[in-house]
From Swiss-Prot:
Pfam family, one: Hus1
Record-given protein name: Checkpoint protein Hus1-like
Sequence similarity: Belongs to the HUS1 family.
Localization per Swiss-Prot or TrEMBL: Cytoplasm; Nucleus envelope
Subunit structure: Component of the 9-1-1 checkpoint clamp complex consisting of Rad9 isoform A, Rad1 and Hus1-like; the interactions with Rad1 and Rad9 are direct. This complex probably also forms with Rad9 isoform B, however 9-1-1 complex containing Rad9 isoform A localizes to the nuclear periphery.
Organism: Drosophila melanogaster (Fruit fly)
UniProtKB keywords: Cytoplasm, Nucleus
Length: 278
């Protein structure tokens, strides 16, 4: 069983760190699924607090890593699956936020315990030579017999999906609306309109976004709506550490809301907010 990956682009290193930092704010632990061409991070609802949603990130290896090698424990296995403290991994990667980082290696090792070693080559202002900053993050190797509990989630089939250009505005709005109602109703239609509705005993507050980009329409569907837990919605938006402003909101009527942030073409952060009974 072997895994080694190398990052060298400063922007890609910061994006990778921001993805892990987002997961850190949602749960203490996460799962890493290391494939031959793709890496996934998953935060399941049973790993997080009751107020956190299901979140996962898919990263195509060639986007971030000019060097990427994975060898599973057995020839018939396609992955290495690891359990890891998202907080510990986040702290190890925090060095990537600053300047002067030439490269960062990720390496699966067994020292006194299985670990992912984060090895950053950092230039300091007092020296022309780079120094290595090493963090060994303990991991749990999940055996193949348990993999069925750690499958990459399936993106739901949305009847309607809209692109929202201002993530910051929606984030601020949901943070306020969660104090009005325990649930939020999201309504979208083919006119490119999104309504976010919070209802209490005293009032109903409707916030409207218009002229949004229509990304998906299923058949002759004219509109779709779904109500979700306002705490879960707020937890997702509040955890985001990525600089991206664009967000895709897809609604699978009465089942779930799918939130998607395309960090770049083959690096995507997903969340599914399940419907609540009204």
């Amino acid at each position: 069983m072997k895994f080694r990956a190398l990052m060298q682009d400063p922007l890609y290193m910061k994006e990778f760190q921001a993805i892990v930092a987002t997961l850190t704010k949602l749960a203490k632990d996460c799962v890493m699924i290391l494939g031959s061409r793709q890496m996934h991070f998953i935060v399941n609802e049973d790993q997080s607090s009751a107020a956190s949603p299901l979140v996962w990130a898919g990263i195509t290896a060639e986007e971030y890593f000019p060097e990427y090698r994975m060898e599973a424990a057995h020839p018939d296995q396609e992955y290495i699956v690891l359990g890891v403290s998202s907080a510990n991994l986040g702290r190890a990667l925090s060095v990537l936020r600053g300047g002067g980082v030439n490269s960062c290696k990720l390496k699966l090792q067994r020292i006194q315990f299985p670990c992912i070693s984060v090895i950053a080559s950092v230039l300091t202002s007092s020296s022309t030579e780079a120094r290595e900053v090493v963090h060994d993050v303990p991991v749990t190797i999940i055996p193949g017999s348990d993999w069925s509990a750690y499958v990459v989630p399936r993106v739901p089939n949305s009847q309607l999906a809209l692109g929202l250009p201002s993530l910051r505005l929606l984030k601020s709005l949901i943070d306020k609306l969660k104090n009005i109602s325990p649930s939020l109703e999201f309504q979208v239609n083919v006119d490119g309109e999104l309504n976010v509705i919070a209802t209490s005993e005293m009032s109903t507050v409707t916030s409207r976004f218009q002229k949004l980009l229509i990304r998906t329409v299923s058949g002759s569907q004219q509109e779709a709506s779904c109500s979700v837990d306002s705490r879960k919605a707020s937890a997702f938006f509040g955890a985001l550490q990525l600089p991206n402003e664009e967000l895709t909101i897809g609604i699978d009527r009465e089942h779930s809301i799918h939130l998607q942030i395309d960090v770049r073409q083959d690096v995507v952060l997903h969340s599914i907010l399940p419907a609540v009974c009204m």
